[in-house]
């Protein structure tokens, strides 16, 4: 009897599995439910899960290639341990950086450098007791001014500088003729210019009160508001210059306009001067109703005043305050009164008529001429502010100006009340840094006028927040030529800059031109402008040519 062999019992069965076909890539198309929502993190077997702190990594000082030897494993936080029981005590902390005022910046820099080994007596630092001294090479590497080593900021240069506004908007119909950069102007020189010769002298001067030389910080004196009229007449509105232009000279200007051009390389703010060429004659004018006569404050400072019109420390408000202080100080230090002697020039004040009964400031006008070569004769109106009686009986003419302190903390300046009596040189040096252009202009005006003395007053606010009340803390006097040498002001370079602009305009055709300092670049531009530009439409028809003077300014009534 034959037996039937069951092959199914001897061999295992094979069932064909279901294979998923992924047309868009490789791997399974669907994920099993057991593996869903499981976080994934790249890891290495030598990594510890949930590291609390890792002290094994060495510090890498190579900032540029700090990720060169870094590993991508163990960097996630999917398996890190979190203590979730103290969530109720968790508070958000405001990490916004608080902007410090300028006077507090860098207060603890020396202390921090001492802790980190970079201080004066720290390890590796500069020791004054003869211990360890850095070599010159290492000092240069650590000095941030050299831009290398630890001092380099890696491109972080702080906020961008603020863009200043131009003194006048350049119009589409203006043609640019020439651009003169400051490095080119600084190299100019016109030596051997002789002293100017007097043509006409006008006005009346009062004598200086010597009691103001004894004022100091402990014996301060309040600044008074002097109710006097100060004329700021431009060149073409001056009746004396109109009279002289028919017979003498071919270039006409005022001392303020000449000082602005001569000291242009020290200016940062924008300014402009209108030039009219008529035949072979040039007239330099300032525009009406502008801020040309206002005195700048901290123009050359590292941190100039902020452009906030609502603040009393904005550039324009400080300029008005400085002009107010200057005019009142120049009149207060004089001996006023009908019984006091006065120094009278040949002619009376040309800007007031005989029937006018107004109190005019003490100003003496000198109309002088200079020979600049190549048949160029300059005629300019210069000013004196006072006169001084010497012990020998001679009279010395003075240019009187005032420096003002507004807020030493905001201006990064020196406390005048602390150092003016003991370290006056440090105070003046700080003013030369912050107001280089203004002091240079005053010096040039004193040299052009032929003043024997340049008297500087130090005027400060009674309260830094109150810009309406001031006190006089002291005075100081210089000889203009010696002071020019002290502040590194070259009159040869000043004459060279003026002659360069005159020669440039002389080559042009007759018409109206404008020179303007770029508000954000060290460049002066010359524009050819239409003849009717800046013409005032509100002039009265009944006024004659000799009476069309620019407005007078009574600074005692200016609201600051």
Curated annotation (Swiss-Prot):
Residue numbers spanned by region Disordered: 98-166
Annotated GO biological process: cap-dependent translational initiation; formation of cytoplasmic translation initiation complex; regulation of translational initiation
Compartments, record wording: Cytoplasm
RNA gate: region residues: 291-305
Molecular function as annotated in GO: mRNA cap binding; translation initiation factor activity
Subunit composition and interactions: Component of the eukaryotic translation initiation factor 3 (eIF-3) complex. The eIF-3 complex interacts with pix.
Keywords, comma-separated and alphabetical: Cytoplasm, Initiation factor, Phosphoprotein, Protein biosynthesis, RNA-binding
Domain comment (free text): The RNA gate region regulates mRNA cap recognition to prevent promiscuous mRNA-binding before assembly of eif3d into the full eukaryotic translation initiation factor 3 (eIF-3) complex.
Positions where Phosphothreonine occurs in the chain: 128
Entry protein name: Eukaryotic translation initiation factor 3 subunit D-1
Comp. bias (Basic residues): 100-121, 147-156
Similarity-based family: Belongs to the eIF-3 subunit D family.
Gene transcribed to yield this protein: eIF3d1
The protein's role, per its UniProt record: mRNA cap-binding component of the eukaryotic translation initiation factor 3 (eIF-3) complex, which is involved in protein synthesis of a specialized repertoire of mRNAs and, together with other initiation factors, stimulates binding of mRNA and methionyl-tRNAi to the 40S ribosome. The eIF-3 complex specifically targets and initiates translation of a subset of mRNAs involved in cell proliferation. In the eIF-3 complex, eif3d specifically recognizes and binds the 7-methylguanosine cap of a subset of mRNAs.
One Gene Ontology term, aspect cellular component: eukaryotic translation initiation factor 3 complex
InterPro entries, alphabetized: eIF3d
């Amino acid at each position: 009897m034959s037996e039937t062999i069951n092959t199914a019992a001897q061999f295992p069965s094979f069932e064909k599995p279901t294979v998923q076909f992924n047309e868009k890539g490789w791997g399974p198309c669907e994920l099993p439910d057991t593996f869903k929502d499981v976080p994934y993190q790249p890891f290495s077997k030598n990594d510890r899960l949930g590291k609390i702190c890792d002290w094994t990594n060495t510090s890498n000082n190579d900032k540029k290639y700090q990720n060169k030897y870094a590993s991508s494993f163990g960097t996630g936080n999917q398996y890190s341990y979190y203590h979730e029981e103290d969530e109720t005590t968790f508070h958000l902390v405001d990490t916004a950086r608080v902007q410090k005022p300028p006077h507090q910046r860098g207060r603890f820099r020396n202390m921090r450098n001492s802790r980190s080994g970079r201080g004066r007596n720290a390890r590796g630092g500069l020791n004054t007791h003869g211990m360890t001294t850095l070599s010159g090479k290492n000092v240069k590497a650590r000095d941030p001014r050299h831009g290398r080593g630890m001092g380099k900021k890696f491109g972080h240069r702080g906020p961008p500088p603020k863009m200043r506004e131009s003194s006048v908007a350049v119009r589409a119909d203006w043609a640019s003729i020439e651009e003169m950069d400051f490095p080119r102007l600084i190299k100019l020189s016109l030596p051997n210019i002789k002293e100017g010769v007097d043509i006409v002298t006008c006005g009346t001067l009062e004598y200086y009160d010597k009691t103001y030389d004894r004022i100091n910080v402990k014996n301060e004196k309040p600044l008074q508001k002097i109710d006097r009229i100060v004329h700021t007449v431009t060149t073409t509105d001056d009746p004396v210059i109109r009279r002289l232009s028919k017979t003498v000279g071919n270039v006409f200007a005022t001392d303020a306009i000449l000082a602005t051009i001569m000291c242009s390389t020290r200016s940062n703010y924008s300014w402009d001067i209108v030039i009219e060429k008529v035949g072979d004659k040039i007239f330099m004018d300032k525009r009406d109703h502008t801020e040309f006569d206002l005195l700048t404050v901290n123009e050359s400072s590292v941190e100039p005043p902020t452009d906030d019109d609502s603040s009393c420390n904005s550039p324009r408000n400080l300029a008005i305050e400085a002009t107010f202080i200057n005019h009142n100080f120049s009149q207060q230090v004089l001996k006023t009164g009908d019984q006091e002697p006065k120094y009278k020039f040949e002619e009376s004040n040309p800007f007031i008529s005989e029937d006018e009964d107004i109190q005019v400031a003490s100003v003496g006008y000198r109309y002088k001429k200079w020979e600049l070569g190549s048949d160029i004769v300059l005629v300019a109106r210069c000013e004196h502010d006072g006169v001084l009686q010497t012990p020998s009986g001679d009279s010395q003419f003075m240019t009187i100006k005032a420096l003002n302190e507004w807020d030493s903390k905001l201006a990064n300046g020196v406390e005048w009340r602390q150092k003016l009596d003991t370290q006056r040189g440090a105070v003046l040096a700080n003013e030369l840094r912050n107001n280089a252009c203004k002091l240079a202009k005053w010096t040039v005006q004193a040299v052009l006028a032929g003043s024997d003395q340049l008297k500087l007053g130090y005027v400060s606010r009674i309260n830094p927040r109150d810009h309406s009340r001031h006190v006089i803390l002291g005075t100081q006097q210089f000889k203009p030529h010696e002071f020019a040498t002290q502040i590194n002001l070259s009159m040869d370079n000043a004459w060279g800059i003026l002659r360069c602009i005159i020669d440039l305009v002389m080559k042009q055709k007759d018409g109206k031109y404008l020179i303007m300092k770029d508000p954000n670049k060290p460049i002066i531009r010359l524009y050819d402008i239409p003849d009717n530009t800046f013409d005032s439409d509100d002039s009265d028809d009944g006024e004659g040519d000799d009476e069309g003077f620019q407005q007078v300014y009574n600074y005692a009534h200016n609201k600051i």
